[in-house]
Amino acid sequence: MQTRLRVYITGEPGVGKTTIFLKVIDKLKSQGYSISGFYCPEVREKGQRIGFKIKSLDNEVEDWLASIYAKSSIKIGKYYITINEDIINKIKEKISKSEIIGIDEIGPMELSVPKLKEIIDYVLNEKPIVVAVVHRKISFKDGKTFVVTYENRNRLDNEIFNYIISSIQ
């Protein structure tokens, strides 16, 4: 597979970007594609967001990315970055073996962690096919960007999946 394809998913907070991303990843997996990467779901406590985890797409690797309770030298907004370097190494190892890479999200928090930024740069520069959720204030010149809205979110996963399949076959 020599195709170079970049698919970016963006939109306002809470519109459904992660849901669409995970649906697209599941559809690609069901077609037999080798996929790895990571996503960063929020963690809530009593209805309030307290931080973010980082999970590999196969859910075998998981740890905290950032938390309001942790203390570290890197702080983004109210969150302290707490990611463990072992987790990053495990995710990087998985990524090196896959043909399609999924990332949720490429945003200020993820880019503030040097080792995580290194993985993101590696993926964007070296891997042939990337599907990524991108913070609404970040844009890339290469690839196709899909903007999630309340009006299109129920059909956008199919549109993105069909675009990817037609681009790589």
UniProtKB/Swiss-Prot annotation:
Pfam annotation, one family: NTPase_1
Reaction catalysed by this enzyme: a ribonucleoside 5'-triphosphate + H2O = a ribonucleoside 5'-diphosphate + phosphate + H(+)
Gene Ontology MF terms: ATP binding; ribonucleoside triphosphate phosphatase activity
Entry keyword set: ATP-binding, Hydrolase, Nucleotide-binding
Function: Has nucleotide phosphatase activity towards ATP, GTP, CTP, TTP and UTP. May hydrolyze nucleoside diphosphates with lower efficiency.
HAMAP family: NTPase_1 (MF_00796)
Sequence similarity: Belongs to the THEP1 NTPase family.
Full protein name: Nucleoside-triphosphatase THEP1
